[in-house]
Amino acid sequence: MTNARILIVEDEAITVSALKRELASLGYEVAATASTTDEALNAVELHKPDLVLMDITLAGNLNGIVGAVAIRGNYHVPVVFLTAHADDQTMERAVTAGAFGYVLKPFSGAGLKAAIETALHKHQTEIENRRAPDRAA
């Protein structure tokens, strides 16, 4: 789904710059950027992105796991985690938070695109499945 609007939540400026360049080259629009979970929640409300790319380890009081739970619960926007931590415990926490996928840092364009497209497709399928009972009634 090219042209998808993506919110980047990352507290390392160099990673934000790299993500912006890569997302643009892949045909995505960067809706906004945020560096904390609080900023991310405000940005989701304001910019209504199609997907959130969120670092698990963020500055501030709330980490990306907590942010993802709030975003999924309140806004029903898919979250794909960015992480340098591929250990089992971190991945389990990401799955429990309702993540639609994850991208390991340093990321590749192909890996980023695959994670985004998979998450968007999975999210669209969820929406269609929620509507299915309405059509049967």
Per-region residue spans from a language model:
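His-Asp phosphorelay/catalytic-motif detector in bacterial-type signaling
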Residues: N3, K48-D50, G73-V79
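Two-component/phosphorelay signaling modules centered on CheY-like receiver
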Residues: E12-A32, T37
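Short amphipathic alpha-helix used as the core "switch/output" element in two-component signaling
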Residues: N42, L62-V77
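Active-site beta3 strand of CheY-like receiver
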Residues: H47-L58
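C-terminal output helix
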Residues: Q89, F107-E117, Q124
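CheY-like receiver
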Residues: A114, H121-A137
